[in-house]
From Swiss-Prot:
Protein name: Protein NIM1-INTERACTING 3
Species the sequence originates in: Arabidopsis thaliana
Key words, A-Z: Coiled coil, Nucleus
GO biological process annotation, one example: regulation of systemic acquired resistance
GO cellular component, one term: nucleus
Length: 112
């Protein structure tokens, strides 16, 4: 009888150990899932911050500064023609160069 009791007692202990091992594996899996979810949420938050940061600082292209007004386009063309003719017919006089620079009209008004 003692042997049967010991055997039953050993089986109960083995069952309890198996249950404890299962519990620990479930807890370990739950921790890993929580860690994965937290890290993915952190990555999403960082990506959103990066997108917001990019939106705050606009990047300018040379096309942003091209004027579409006909009068300004004519002034730019005249200045380009005068500078090319001045470089072709360079005689060293500063008056001619200063005259070509004063004909250029630039709009420096900033708007938001």
């Amino acid at each position: 009888m003692d042997r049967d009791r010991k055997r039953v007692k050993m089986e109960k202990e083995d069952d309890e150990e198996e249950k404890m091992e299962k519990l620990y594996t479930v807890l370990k899996n739950a921790r890993e899932m929580r860690k994965y979810v937290n890290s993915s949420m952190e990555k999403k938050r960082q990506e959103e911050e990066e997108r917001a940061r990019v939106r705050r600082f606009p990047s300018f292209q040379p096309e942003d500064f091209i004027f579409m007004n006909k009068a300004e386009a004519n002034n730019i063309e005249k200045a380009a023609n005068e500078s090319s003719s001045a470089s072709n017919e360079y005689d060293g006089s500063k008056e001619k160069q200063e005259g070509s620079e004063t004909n250029v009209c630039l709009d420096l008004n900033l708007s938001l």
